[in-house]
Amino acid sequence: MKVAIVGASGAVGRELLKVLEQRNFPADELLLFGSERSAGRVYPFRGKQIGVRLLAHNDDFKGVDVAFVSAGAGTSKEFAETITKHGALMIDNSSAFRMDEDVPLVVPEVNPEDALNAPRRIIANPNCTTIQMVVALNALEKLSHIRRVHVATYQSASGAGAQGMAELEEQHAALAKGGEPRVEKFAYQLAYNLIPHIDVFTDNDYTKEEMKMYHETRKIMHSDIAVSATCVRVPVMRAHSESIWVETERPISPEEARDAFASVSYTHLRA
């Protein structure tokens, strides 16, 4: 299988490179793509050094079977046709196509069958907070239909990418020296702070991040679930956490819920 990673130098791209190697993904050939800033960089993969190519509108994706794209919504929209025109399956990590009717939004533990219907050769990856929530919700949905969800998220600096993590680190260093921290990636200073403001506010006074959880959850689960989210940025480098309140049509006992969660792949029940 010929595999490509677009955005290979970003935080997600570098992590994906590690995961493909750790899980022995069947990639006979791997191509890395990036912007002018990252083109020419070299990364190790299975004992080889692979250089980053400049992403351009050409035929570099000819023969590629799967392209993992994590370079932002603008790049995904601009290069989708270039990536897929020779038959490559584009798995997109951005918000560019998530709500398009002809693009499946897939979490493998929840709706893998949706991936089989991808007429544009694009599969969208949901927002990070949506993914971890729907895996848990799906276990409960199998017991009783979920009516509504209230969720509070606590999201690390990694959600803002490598630049976000770097800014948090710089802020801690500046404050330790009595200096003024630089604030660019976040709405406010993140170090020693909590920011209930991720992305821009929409007309209904929820942030765009919060509305992603509403719309994406309903699409993934093919459900009319009502979702109210409060998304908070917290001053840690990695790991998101969520506190979720769920109302179901029939009462579910704690024992039923524990058994349901225990049966879900890639989850660890602590109860």
PLM region spans:
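Short glycine-/small-residue-rich Rossmann-like dinucleotide-binding loops
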Residues: 71-72, 95, 127
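Beta-loop-alpha module in the N-terminal Rossmann-like domain of NAD(P)-dependent dehydrogenases
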Residues: 71-80
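Rossmann-fold NAD(P)-binding glycine/threonine-rich loop
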Residues: 81-89, 93-119
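Conserved small/polar residues in nucleotide/adenosyl-binding loops
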Residues: 267-271
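Conserved N-terminal Rossmann-fold NAD(P) cofactor-binding segment
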Residues: 22-63
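N-terminal Rossmann-like NAD(P) cofactor-binding module of classical short-chain dehydrogenase/reductase
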Residues: 66-68
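Active-site-lining helix/loop region of Rossmann-like oxidoreductase modules
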Residues: 6, 11-15, 26-28, 38, ...
